[in-house]
Amino acid sequence: MKPPSLRGWSLSLASGPSGLVGLMGLAIALAAPPAAAAELELQGSRLVVSGMLDGSAIKEFTDRLTSGTVHTVVFEDSFGGTADAAGAFADAIRASGVQTEVRGQCMAACAYAFLAGKTHRFGYGPQVNGILLPVAQRPTAAELAVRWRGDEAHKTLAEFTPTSAVAKPIETSAAPSATGDAKDNWQPDHGVLFTASPTLFGRIYNTYYCDGTQGRDFSKCERLADADPFKLGVLTP
């Protein structure tokens, strides 16, 4: 495990019209290496998870949590992953009652697993922290207010991972299955991005909507007003 770093993040800060320092750009370098499968490292009572949540490490992860020695799961620099893997990691976290923390970047599958913690917080330190929660379509302000609060996060993820696949006669060859629709809706780069950037005045929190066309350049995402991650339940105090 490498120590946390700012590798891959491009950050620029500038004063807005109100004179407050705000986040103006956040990007992941195009030259960043492909995401590796999840790796686990136990550091005392903290289990550090880095890499993509693809399900390959779920058994080891579950075993670690059921041992009773882990109090906090720390996600560090995790990108991509599947909705199924997100659900499996989230279920294990929820069942064990551990806390979760993000140190660096936690995108897509990692973000939903992060929300399953008894408490879920951004880690301290000089790094830029960020999570991106995939959505099937742009959420309204009313949906944002409840979408990831408490058990709603579990229900939202379930939209991407249907558990019932009852066999039905196929009416037309072009008709997609419900399972197919749900999986097609899971786009790791399409979602709501929450960031915390260190400044001389403390951390600045911002929220953005990313339509998936931004690629690795999150500075192209649209900033959302009145979307404080604490008020929305994405982060706990």
Per-segment meaning from a language model:
Residues 37-60:
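STAS-typified acidic loop motif
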Residues 58-62, 86-90, 94, 111, ...:
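Extracytoplasmic/secreted envelope proteins and their assembly/folding machinery
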Residues 70-85, 99-105:
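Short, glycine-/small-residue-enriched flexible loop/hinge segments at domain edges that mediate gating
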Residues 94-141:
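Glycine-rich beta-to-alpha active-site loop
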